[in-house]
Amino acid sequence: MGHIVQGSDEETYFFTQEKLEQRNIPMFYYNEENIKEGYEVILGNAFDDTHIECRRAKELGLKIYTYAQFLGKLLEETPSIAVTGAHGKTTTTTMTSNIFKHNRVTSYLIGDGTGHGEKNSDFMIAEACEYYRHFLAYHPDYAIVTNIDFDHPDYFNDEYDMFDAFQSFVNQVKNTVVICGDDRLASKLKPAHAKTITYGFNDGNDYQIKNVQTSTEYSKFDIYKNNTLLGTFTMAIFGLHDISNATSAIALADINGISVEKIQESLDLYRPAERRFSEYKFGSNVVVDDYAHHPSEIKATIDSARRKYAGKQIVAIFQPHTYTRTAKFLNEFAESLLTADKVFLCPIFASVREKEKIVGIEDLQKVTPGSEIIHGEEDFDKLNFENTVFLFMGAGNINKLCHKFFEKNTSN
């Protein structure tokens, strides 16, 4: 889009910085000297205006945006699509961007750190996060809502508070909202101005999924538009939740005049987002790195593994993310994890915002019969299985443990 970009972060490595390194975007450690005259400053969601670089920007009289404010500004500059939902945002944004970028001039920004900018885009596609109601900074032309499921208990009071946030968001959409009609709460949304299109497996949806077939390589499914076959689609995805997510992207592409043939060509080129069922194999085993950090996401990830690798043992290695979420969903986490054949738990990865340890991993172990605790690579001997899918799940830094486990088993 023509802007010169640099950024600052703490010294700890995180997987999203890899995309920045590939584009030669300068990254610095926090220092007020990083901020110069003439800069525009975007403040990440984890920080406030007391941050050392933000204070320097204010001293210089620079324009300071929150991430949501700046993204909202970008979405106003071109026809825009915002993808939101409690679960599946990143995957669905990736799917939608994949279709549109092969058929229209498209800019996009995805939660796994992936993005692309064009000066004169036909569309700007962005992942829209509900946390702290950040997405209320956006007034997109189109939106996808994958689901509404209570999360972020450190901010939202309950599912009704969360529903209210989503209702406020869809009220700001200008043209069309594509909503999962199967979802208990999302299906109740009533946009104030935009048209509503529904999708899902159930009868009555505008775009209905039927005749799902799954192999170890792909899933094949039909989509009916208003009870008439739109097309048969094939994709390298495996869970029913991902087929549902794909259907929302297909519906939005169809609404915008992209042909079924062009949609399928784009789906053939689809690759999963970072840390969304990322697979590595050794011997008879499969290692999966996945961002699942909510009970619903864990259950869906285990379901995907069973569908793709029927006959293999499923071992879940889970690192809870934040004390508040772990405490709120303690029993729900246990219930979802126990759909695996064996469960291992890692110490909780706390948020920088959390000041008090209100729950420990031992509390989750108590309600998860048969589970064991893994503290680090010194406990890898506990994972001595064959013909197994190892699911490393969590939103913290469990991906590092996952990669160390894979390296240990492939270094000889």
Model-derived features: positions:
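Beta-strand->loop->alpha-helix junctions that form or flank phosphate-binding loops
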Residues: 6-11, 28-30, 65-69, 109-110, ...
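Cofactor-binding loop segments of dinucleotide-utilizing enzymes, especially the Rossmann-like FAD-
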Residues: 10, 69, 86, 111, ...
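N-terminal leader/targeting and accessory segments in enzymes
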Residues: 1-66, 70, 210-211, 230
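ATP-dependent carboxylate-amine ligase
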Residues: 1-12, 21-26, 41, 62, ...
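Phosphate-binding loop of NTP-binding sites
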Residues: 36, 45-195, 247, 254, ...
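Short, charged/polar "capping" segments at the starts of alpha-helices
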Residues: 12-17, 35-37, 48-50, 116-117, ...
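Acidic-glycine-rich active-site phosphate/pyrophosphate-binding loop
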Residues: 212-230
